Amino acid sequence: MNRPHKPTTDPTGKTQTRSRWRWWAVGLAGVTGLALTTVGTPAASAANTAGRNLTTVDDQPSTGNHRDKSGKGEKERKPPGTPVPCDADALIAAITLANARGGATLNLASKCTYLLTAPIDDAGLPDITTPITLNGDKHTTITRAAAAQQFRILTVNTGGDLTLNHLTITGGQTDNDGGAILVNTGGALTTNHSTITRNIAATAGGGIANNGTTTVNHSTVSRNTASDSGGGIHSLGLLNVRESHVDANIANAGGGIFESGSTVTVTGGSISGNQAGTTGGLFVFGANGVVTGTKITRNTSSGSGTGVRVDNTAQLTMRHVNVSDNTSDISGGGLFVGEGDNFAVVEDSLLKNNTATFTGGGIFNSGETVLRRTKVVGNQADVGGGIQNFGTVNLFTTKVTKNIAITTGGGILNSGGTVNLNTATGTVVIKNRPNNCVNVPGCAG
């Protein structure tokens, strides 16, 4: 089993490739000669941008849905803040000055790609150390130039609080954590209506590596790759994912999301089409998790626990979750609950059409699992098509139907554990092939 990746050293503690004074000079005197270019709308002078005060009233985030004298609401007006022309040098200068002045809101140009060609302390942009908001517009992108040396796009350090609105972050590549964004301990990241795509990390967190606090709102994290864990998101801190899509990412463990040692909350959205050696979708490793109203579908893994895995003293609650069409080459196509002090509660949910080559097509349980008002339908494995149990499973008002085992235990195969059907609550185990249950008291074979 893969062990959680340790947080990397704060990039500010590493040997600096460029002295910090140079970037202060850049931010205050105008950015020239840094081999950074952009494509898009013609740029204004970076010096003009750098010279503005980024902490005036106009630069602060809006706090309410007020209307101006013309009667227009917030959604009809440009967000308050300092405009940054379509020029990577100008963006670097603006962030540098924002850090110096205690934070700012920066409005990036629409239909613009800010093209970064040289790293600053392992990232294409200056480390975020204060509250900074980057507002994108239509088709605003920040990317690393394809021919440039490897670096991630953004690092959020202690005291930094970065908000991304309507932005695409792409092309980051690092031999450490966080292909696109690294959030260090004491840092915070919020993405709203943004896309993190096609980034690569040689270790953990192909899209985002979170060691602080990260919130992903109405955003997409897709097509990122990590050689270790967390193809989309690797988190050792607090992680909230709301109405977002973590899809088509690749990792050795936790293709979509890997959470270790803290808490992950996923609400709505999807974790779909991810690939991994172990657990294509969501891997909760020595952590706590709550998933509500999310589709966890079409994930694949060559190991165990493809849709969701709960392991290494972890707890997970899933409500109104659709875990369907996931495929494992070993066990636990839909849900895998590891041996020992691991606990899963599944309520008002569906585990359907999941497949495991060997055992536990729908659920593989070696810990403790509780199913309430849940359907385990149409899953398939060699043994234990619906559920394979080595631990304790309690079912309440749950249906285990139309599952298939090639050998035995079409519905439930109990292998030395405890299965409590609680049939008085309405639990039924029927229409499974070649049989409904093996070693399950109160279940007709």
Question: What is each stretch, according to the model?
Answer:
Residues A104, C112, T130-I132, K138-T140, ...:
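The right-handed parallel beta-helix/beta-solenoid scaffold, focusing on the short coil/turn
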Residues L395-G445:
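Leucine-rich solenoid repeat scaffolds
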Residues M1-P7, P11-A46:
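Secretory targeting and sorting signals
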Residues T96, L116-T133, T143-L164, T170-A188, ...:
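Extracellular beta-strand-rich solenoid/capping regions of secreted or surface-exposed proteins
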Residues I120-A123, A147-T155, D175-L182, A201-A209, ...:
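Extracellular beta-strand/beta-solenoid scaffold signature
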Residues G159-G254, G261, T265:
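Right-handed parallel beta-helix
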Residues P80-L106:
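Acidic Gly/Asp/Thr-rich repetitive segments characteristic of extracellular carbohydrate-active
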